[in-house]
Amino acid sequence: MKQISSIFIILCSISCGGPRGNWSDPRVILISIDGLRGDILNNSTYTKDYPNLTRLMTDGEYCTSVQTVFPSLTYPSHTSMITGVTPAKHGIVNNRPFMPKNNFVDWYWYADSIEVPTLITKAAQNGLVTVGVSWPVSVGAKMDWMLPEIKSVNDTISTIDLVRQHDRPESFLESAKVFGVVPKDGNPSGYNRDLLLHEIFMDAFVRKAPHLSLYHMIETDLIQHKFGKSSNEAKDAFMFMDSLVGNILAFLDDNKLWESTTLIITGDHGFRNYEKQVSLNRLFEKEGWLTLNNGSISDWKVVCLGSGGSGFVRLKDPTDQEFKKRVRLLLSEQDAFEILEQRHMNGALWAS
């Protein structure tokens, strides 16, 4: 009984104490709905399907033609949101770091991979209270209250245990259990995961009154990848996210916080339907330039790391000009794609 009481006191001190803002202070809430596209506004039933987004468009300002970064992936885009620079400058040039020997299974989870200052670091320097829930590239970020986005890529540890290792402050996730937010066996997926993340965000936001909130909604992206951007499933996913946004609006309404609140709803990238998938690494394997062993890359002279609708081709020895010519010739003979080299990219795409 004494041990249980000690644990509860520790968790309660984490949950009830620590940095807290003031509701009269100015605050920014940045919500990213993964895969949110401007063309969903073309749906004739938009106002009925998405009443909360419609309200924000009516009462606030909106833009339907935002240009994302290159490459148009979740992690580069989210990092540009909080740095204001392109991936070429902030260093998160893909969802996954270039690690062919581990089959590119790891992602850019860690905030120390970002090469420039962020909103998070600036907020910390100015003594502002911050909350982050499932924000990409946030593991290790100096946020006051943070549940990072990270996923287990092997059988040695579960995703929920990884999150427990990296939340801030220590036992932030456990403290949410004390408040009845997280179920004891909480390792959900799909809509249940987004619902759980929403409960955690609302719990932290209400109790901590942060100056800066970063909140990432996920399932809209996964549904569009699985069923297509124009599917009924995608429409349902956006309707679900709209309802979560509605909970935040209701809290701001009930507590009369609009005068001190700037709320930003955005997406990170769009979607295009496709019929074919190109595997350049299979092409390189046929040429003997890449070796696979039980589906894993064991050796390579050239390799491609996919980046959504594009891919980065790298040579192990970039100084081998003769081999570079052979690779360029092979790629130029394919009709499924075009080749862009750095000299072809304008500043909007790849400003370094």
Predicted feature descriptions by range:
Residues 18-61:
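Active-site-proximal N-terminal segment of extracellular/periplasmic enzymes that hydrolyze or transfer
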Residues 29-32, 63-65, 80-82, 130-134, ...:
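Structural recognition of the beta-strand scaffold that forms the well-ordered cores
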Residues 23, 40-41, 191-215, 220-261:
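A long, amphipathic alpha-helix that forms part
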Residues 37-43, 66-68, 78, 105-110, ...:
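Second-shell loop/turn segments in exported
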Residues 86-228, 335:
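His/Asp/Glu-rich, glycine-adjacent segments
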Residues 24-29, 59-62, 126-131, 208-213, ...:
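Loop/turn elements at helix/coil->beta-strand transitions in domains of secreted/extracellular proteins
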Residues 1-24:
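Bacterial Sec-dependent N-terminal signal peptides
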Residues 26, 71, 97, 101-111, ...:
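Secreted, luminal/periplasmic, and some membrane-associated catalytic domains
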